[in-house]
Amino acid sequence: ESIILDLGNKAEAVIMREDMLPRENFRPGDRVRGVLYKVNPESKTAQLFVTRAKPEMLIELFRIEVPEIGEEMLEIRGAARDPGSRAKIAVKSNDKRIDPVGACVGMRGARVQAITNELGGERVDIVLWDDNPAQYVINAMAPADVTSIIVDEDNHSMDIAVNADNLAQAIGRNGQNVRLATQLTGWTLNVMTTEQLNEKHQAEDIKVLNLFMDKLGLDEEFAQILVDEGFTSLEEVAYVPVSELTAIDGLEDEDLIEELQGRAKDAITAAAAAEEEALKKANIEDRLLNLEGMNRHIAFKLAEKQITTLEELAEQGVDDLADIEELTAEQAADFIMAARNICWFSEE
């Protein structure tokens, strides 16, 4: 379960099994490199915890092997690991004369190879950090080549398209490549083929087109203009600056725009009133409504699935909520775990 490390001067540290690399075994007398990540001051003698499996270990090894990092010419912006198997680390240069990836790789790969050897053969992808999130994700997906990418700021997710013959490499064995890229960048990444991405967004465009025709009373040609200009919701139409609408060919008439935005606002108000009425009829439990991160719209979507109490939410799986478009898989998991913590694990 764990081993004790003698640090000298009568000091000891603990390294738990989960903080070791897979298939890693130590014998008495072995020298072990690790990172101190936690101190438990409540024990009789302050207990020190060391890890070899957390991202901090990878980061510190790069600090040791790449002197430019210590000199602040290079900066580590993040790391993600599948310990003992594969990792990704993001770096940026604070000196335009230095190639951050080349500096981390080293002459003939010597620097990164030393780190790989220390971590039991763990293969490390060195990723060039970028302040443009889309470009950063493209870099993080290497060695896969991304053909196109669509960013969803609201859900903090991206749809990534690759050629069909590159899909397996992009996803990686057991999803490893996309999982590490997700952890590194902090974005939810949906990988698919170029054809699948086109089909998905064509379906979404048709859905928005029908929404505008139905709720705004527009003919198909007018609604298509809005879709082509990138409008995806009634809220965008209602509250976008008038100057952006007048810049669209065929929408130069401000009276027409005023009427269009008025219809959009009326439709939003009507939908909110209908949703509020449905919430009252659903008799949703206050504990569910008061869950951290919950809003009335998501609560309404849950009620449509006959989930009106915290206990009912706790019994769900992430897949059960997958058809709620407003929820990412991560958000669904957070809601479910929060409900379980309150219903199943609370001491009250």
Task: Set out the residue ranges of the language-model regions.
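RNA-contacting regions in translation and RNA-metabolism proteins
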Residues: 1-348
